[in-house]
Amino acid sequence: FGGFSKSSQKLFWSIYHKMPEHLKDKCYFKELNKEFLVSVNNIFYLYDFVISNINLCIEFNGDIWHANPNKYKKDDTVLFTNKLASDIWDKDENKIKILKEHRNIDTLVIWESDWTKNKHDIEIDIINKICELDTKRISTSTISC
C-alpha cells in the first residue's frame, strides 16, 4: 500500500515516546506496527498515525503529494501525480470523512512544510492534544478509583 515519508516517522516516533504508556498499545503507524486501515465497500484507506482509544488520527501531508493549498491553486496540475490540486484535496477530505463516519476518529493534518519550520511547537501541540483527549476519555468513563 501507500508510501510514507521519513520525516513523518521521525515525528511519530517522537510523539510515541512522549505519550502516556497506557495509550501505546492502541497506537498505529508504519514503522511501529502498521498504518491504521479502514475498509469501506472494498475500498481501503490507510491512515498515518492513529491512537484508536482516544479517537485521534494524524495525517502527515507532503506538500507535493497532497498539494499544500499554501503552494498550489485548485486548478494546478501537481508534479509527479499528474492530478489537479482540487482532486487531491477532495480525495484527502473524503478519507478524513470516512474515518470520522466509520470509526468516530478525528483527524489533525500536519503539513510537511509546517513541520520543517516548526517541529518543536507542532510536537508540543500534538502531545497537548493527546493529553486533553486522554483526560476527557478518563473523566467520562464509568470506572471509579
Model-derived segments and spans:
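Nucleic-acid endo/exonuclease domains
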Residues: 1-145
